[in-house]
Amino acid sequence: SMSIALNPNKIDHVGHLGPAITGGIGAMLNLDEETIYQAIQYSAHTSIFTRQGRKGDLSSWKAFAPGLVGRNAIDAIDRAIRGEKGPSPVWEGDYGIVPILLHKENENIEINLPEKNGPRSGILSTFTKEHSAGYHGNSIIDLAFLLREKIKDLKEIKKINIYSKKYTHIVMGSGSNDPEKYSPEASRETLDHSAMYIFAVALEDGFWHHETSYSKERKQKQETIKLWKKVETFEDSDFNQRYYNEKDPLKKVQGAKVEV
């Protein structure tokens, strides 16, 4: 829920995934409300990490963090079934996740839950990725596909400026201040969150593949490196407004403007 937003406070979003998995397992097992409640609190407490795992010199932690909180969720259910309780109240308590880690007043938080047996609003508002790259970079790949039809010789390009919303700029773009996002030695976990890399490769190839687009041979091509270094991102107020001010998740503008 954006009403308990982890990202602005540099907390990894798997902090939501752990409790969500726990709730799902509890529902599948038809457990009673109190057992699920305690399991969710236990899971929430063991699923909070900083976003450093997604910044700087990345390791396989980024890839396996969802699996870890999934394991924590199973453990939480198992312990709750056996009578163990979680830290309570884990979110809104005086020393809980919200006041200590998220720095928000408890009374300002509103959580919209689906009606019983009603549509699962959280799932239905999810933006599904078409390409195997960062959430905020999918539209950039599509833009590269469109632009490559209009550019006769990529070697003549002097500069590429990408204007988009804040998250694209600071999470995947040059606004992250991560030099690794420009490095041909960077890991796949880094490059799938480099708007500069994915735009350059998509512009050259005209397709995106979940493995070959990140291979050592692909990322170390000299022509690609030259093009890659010419790409820079910028935060754009218009895209910010059309993304952050839109209440309907499926109507949020995900795109960008590209100047070549």
Where do the PLM segments sit?
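Terminal-appendage/accessory-domain detector
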Residues: 61-71, 78-260
